[in-house]
Each structure stands twice: as C-alpha cells, then as structure tokens.
Amino acid sequence: MDSNTVSSFQDILVRMSKMQLASSSEDLNGMITQFESLKLYRDSLGEAVMRMGDFHSLQIRNGKWREQLSQKFEEIRWLIEEVRHRLKITENSFEHITFMQALQLLLEVEQEIRAFSFQLI
C-alpha cells in the first residue's frame, strides 16, 4: 500500500475520532471500526497479490474468499452512503472536509480492492 493511502487512512481515523456528532457517537465509532477493518482487508489483498502463487494458499486457507469480498463491497457501499448522508446534513466545515476526504478515500479503496480481486481471479 502506498504511504499516501496509509497516511490518509490514519488522518481520517484520527479526525473522525475527534468529531462530536449530534447523532450517537456509536454510529461514528461503527464507521471508524469499519474503516479500520476495510484498511486491513485491503492491505491483506494487496499483500496476496504481491506474493506470486499466494492465491492458491488464500483459496486453501479460506474457501469463502469470494463471499468475503462480496461482504467487503457491501460494507464499502454502506460506508459511502453513510458518508454521503453525513455530508448532506453537516454544517460544520471541519466535519464536511473530513467526510469529503473519507468519501474520496473510500472510492479509491473500492477501486484498489476491485483491481486486487481481478488480479486474484
């Protein structure tokens, strides 16, 4: 994973953890947890692509990797919709900028995961 993406994830997670939303903080904590999970999943897919032949060990280790991949895309779509919703309702510029960056990062990560998964297929 490139260092800009790592710092983008870290920056957004730190900024989101500092935000106090009018709605429940559980919602935001859930988003943060999903961002972290998504980052780890994307990293592991990227590492699998980097190692030649690792696809076979990935299949042996986890025969349901396609199902996991599908679930991750569902999570990404949910996060994108949640971030878009937050963008529509927020009036705070700090929150707006944070959610804009989160949306951009989600779209980039979705594209990277798609690229990794096509290489594994």
UniProtKB/Swiss-Prot annotation:
Pfam (any one): Flu_NS2
Range of residues in the leader sequence: none
The gene coding this protein: NS
Keyword Oxidoreductase part of the UniProt annotation: no
Any further remark recorded for this protein: Average number present in a viral particle is estimated to be 130-200 molecules.
Transport as UniProt keyword: yes
Keywords in alphabetical order: Host nucleus, Host-virus interaction, Transport, Virion
One of the GO biological process terms: exit of virus from host cell nucleus through nuclear pore
Protein name (record): Nuclear export protein
Biological source species: Influenza A virus (strain A/Hong Kong/212/2003 H5N1 genotype Z+)
